[in-house]
Amino acid sequence: MQQHPKHRLRSDKPVDSRLNNMRIFLILVFSLFVVACSDYQRARSAYEGGDYQKAFELFKKLSESGDTRAEYDLSKMYLQGIGTKQDVGQGWLWMIKAADHGNTMAMVELGGRYEYGVNLERDETQAVFWFKKAALAGSSVGSYNLAKMYMDGRGVKQDPARGYAWMVISAQKGGNPIAKAEADAYKAKLSPELQAKSDQMVKQLEADPNF
């Protein structure tokens, strides 16, 4: 009978140790996050203060450590030749990295550049690809731009119901009154059959954005 409490105490000790290790790990992760945030803010402050060379150096350092916000900012500086010599190749490299790492602003900008052929050959199919990727990642702007592509049938087969649905989702995600007004005006032009299909499409995309 005396062995049970002893056994319990021995098994509790490593549990406490693991909990302490977990606390230490979480503290370290949080500390690194705070440092990364403060470093990024220093880079932004340098940029907004006109010290572009310093901002470029800070963004580059952060980008090399995987900060997606810095990757996007660095790409813009390369593309525009701010704080460094213009290098379109490096600009694209870092913008694609930022997009691949989940930066929705980079995704939307890539879509826009493909849509209008800025610094590259115009490709509306690629524009749809990046707008959709941004929309699926929760971007209201990405959803809006994707809606327009479906409505106009650019880079994708024209689909009024799907275009309307993505416009509604854009309005819901971003609280965008323009998107809401455009969705309502667009729906009013549709036949009753397409209006019903559009309403159903909204529900389907809300349940499964990949639908």
How would you label these PLM feature ranges?
Residues G50-D51, E64-D67, Q80-I82, D87, ...:
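Short helix-capping/linker turns of helical repeat alpha-solenoids
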Residues S45-A46, L62, D73-Q80, E109-Y116, ...:
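Hydrophobic face of amphipathic alpha-helices that form TPR/SEL1-like repeat modules
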Residues P177-F211:
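Terminal, low-structured helical/coil segments at or just beyond the last alpha-helical repeat
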